[in-house]
């Protein structure tokens, strides 16, 4: 089992140039749990994850890992505890799958330490877990988008960190591989106690797989808590500007969001939030 770590953001303000993206945000990540961050496009989700992983320094406030500011922690030392799979990563030209996944072991290498049997085992386990072992000798350049994404996830797993941050890990994946990846993260959490923080666009997947949801709107936390507490019709309207219905997923028992558009509604009238009536058109 991994060591439990506290990861928090305290009054964090982030931005690019003259633009502020996250403003005075406070966040506590439950240790040993799976947290999903959701929100509309450009609300600050990915920016927050970049700051939590030391890639973007706050203008004010701090991101703390076990009470120490991550931006004051040496990069290699931090990488032994906290791993990141960024959005749309780029691989060096011509690198093979095995070599890329092996780079996940670099934080564990030192001036005097050499590649070990444990490193081989960590890479093999990561390849098997992501169903990419058969691709080990192929160039990453040759792979499909879905295959590449699974290889990047394998590299993150090979790093064997106690805290794992993932920015849209199901990007480019078909629905079956989306489920496989999310199941894999749950297995990692349950078997190793890994703290997982992931940005997801699919609200229903987030509610099904996360223990803790964080909904961000306009650079601040709008709501946080259990999926049942956060995924409400009021939150969906406030965060996404979308009318919806929330029902219980009959397979998982978690909240299931049904979006209400202007078309393809049932012929009978459906009450909309605020007492308005909606019909098919």
Q: What do these predicted regions represent?
A:
Residues 114, 139-143, 147:
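Conserved ABC ATPase signature
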Residues 7, 21-24:
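Conserved structural motif at the start of ABC-family nucleotide-binding domains
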Residues 53:
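Helix-to-loop junction immediately C-terminal to a conserved catalytic motif
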Residues 102, 117-135:
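Conserved ABC ATPase "signature" region
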Residues 61-69, 78:
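Conserved ABC transporter NBD signature motif
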Residues 38-40:
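The feature captures the beta-strand-to-loop junction immediately N-terminal to the Walker
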Residues 164-168, 173:
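Catalytic Walker B motif of ABC-type/P-loop ATPase nucleotide-binding domains
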């Amino acid at each position: 089992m991994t060591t439990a770590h506290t990861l928090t953001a305290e009054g964090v303000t982030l931005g690019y140039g003259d633009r502020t993206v996250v403003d005075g945000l406070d966040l506590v990540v439950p240790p040993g749990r799976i947290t999903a961050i959701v929100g509309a496009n450009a609300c600050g989700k990915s920016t927050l994850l970049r700051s939590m992983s030391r890639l973007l320094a706050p203008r004010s406030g701090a991101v703390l890992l076990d009470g120490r500011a991550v931006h004051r922690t040496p990069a290699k030392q931090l990488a032994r505890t906290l791993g990141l799979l960024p959005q749309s990563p780029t691989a060096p030209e011509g690198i093979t799958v095995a070599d890329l996944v092996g780079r996940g072991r670099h934080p564990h290498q030192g001036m005097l330490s050499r590649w070990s049997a444990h490193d081989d085992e960590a890479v093999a386990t990561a390849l098997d877990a992501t169903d990419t072992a058969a691709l080990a000798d192929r160039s990453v350049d040759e792979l499909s988008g879905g295959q590449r994404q699974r290889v990047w996830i394998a590299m993150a797993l090979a790093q064997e960190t106690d805290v794992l941050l993932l920015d849209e890990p199901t990007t480019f994946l078909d629905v079956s591989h989306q489920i496989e990846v999310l199941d894999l993260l749950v297995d990692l959490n349950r078997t190793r106690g890994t703290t997982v923080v992931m940005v997801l666009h699919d609200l229903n997947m987030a509610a099904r797989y996360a223990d803790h949801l964080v909904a961000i709107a306009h650079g601040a936390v709008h709501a946080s808590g259990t999926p049942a507490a956060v995924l409400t019709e009021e939150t969906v309207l406030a965060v996404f500007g979308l009318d919806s219905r929330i029902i219980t997923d009959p397979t998982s028992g978690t909240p299931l969001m049904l979006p209400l558009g202007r078309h393809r509604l049932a012929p009978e009238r459906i009450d909309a939030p605020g007492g308005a009536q909606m019909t098919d058109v």
